[in-house]
Every structure is written in C-alpha cells, then in structure tokens.
Amino acid sequence: MIDEFKTISDTVGEGYYTEKRSKFLAFAHHVTTVDEVKEIVAGYRKKYYDARHCCYAYMLGPERTEFRANDDGEPSSTAGKPILGQITKAELTDILIVVIRYFGGVKLGTSGLIVAYREAAIDALAHCEEVTQQVEEIVTYDFTYPMMNDVMRIVKEMNPHIVDQTFDNTCTIKLSIRKSEAEQLRTRLKKLSFE
C-alpha cells in the first residue's frame, strides 16, 4: 500500500537549454488533475504562440498510474518520452513538465532532440522544490454524546486531522489520517460501540 509519494511544491520550476540555436524553455508544475494539465498546456500554447513546439509529459496519482507524453509534432518519442523519463527517474507524481521549443534553423536529429528535451526537463526539475506528501484517507464515525471522552481520547492518541465535527443527540466526527493508519483508527472507534 502506497502511504506517501514525492511531488514538487506549487512554485513553478523553470529550465532552459540551447542546442544549435534552438531554444528549449521548460516549466515544471504541481498538478493533480488532467483538467489542470490541459489548462496549463493551453496557457503555454497561447503565451508562446510563435514557438514551433509545445511538448509535455505528466504523471498523476500516488500510484503513478495516470501519465501521458506528448511530442506535439516532433518525431515520435523524441520529446514527450524523454520528459516523462525524467519524471519517472526522479520518482515524482502529480507533476507536469512543459517544454517549449523555438527552432533555430538547424535540425537536431533524433538523438539531438532526445538529449535537448531531456536536458531541459532536468534543468526545470533542478529548479523545483521536492516535497513528500502523505496519502490520506477520510474516516467518519457516528457516536452518542456519552461516548465523547473515549472518542476524543483516541483522536488525541492517533492524532488525525479533524475535518469536520457535529455534536448533537448523535455526534459525527470526520477525520483525515494517513492511509496506513486508517484501519487501526476505524477498529479502535468501532470497539467503543461495543463497550
């Protein structure tokens, strides 16, 4: 079970690489959805409308199962895959790297393109702050008011984040806790119901 994952902070990491007068501008973003990816890529296409290519790669989710590499007109697997390769090598997720290419008039060839896009991605990652995030799970528990002290004792001991709580005839508490500890929290709370 994946309990934590590596990603980057919300600060955009910028990279730059030149090869035979072609300029490669790279930008690394923290993202969590495909819609965010589309919005950011569209923004770069609009901002750098005069650039020849806007290639990108992304990886999403703690399990790192959702990913895509886009060559945007470059020869197959010469742009998106090298960018994705750097994301994979760094074991990052919830990340998008966009590389903008301004053509310098000299063709780089397949290997030259692979190196250029890879190096631009490496430079963008070098200017990012890497962070480790926990995979959280929400646990909701309903209990009667007389059980309050016991519930709060468990909350204090296990230290989950209290997302929401309502205290009435029937009380409800909504907790966010590290995924690996969620089952233990559920078990301890359920035991209170039978005491």
Please name every model-derived segment:
Residues 54-56, 130-139, 165-169:
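Interdomain boundary/hinge elements
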Residues 1-77, 164:
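C-terminal regulatory domains involved in ligand/effector binding and gene-expression control
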Residues 67, 74-108:
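Ordered, amphipathic secondary-structure segments that act as subunit-interaction surfaces
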Residues 175, 181-184:
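Terminal, non-globular segments
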Residues 48-51, 158-163, 190-195:
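A common structural junction motif
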Residues 26-30, 137-143, 170-177:
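Short cationic amphipathic helices and targeting signals
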Residues 151-157, 184-193:
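Short amphipathic alpha-helices in soluble, non-transmembrane regions
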Residues 96-99, 106-150, 154-155:
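Glycine- and Gly-Pro-enriched alpha-helical subdomains that act as flexible
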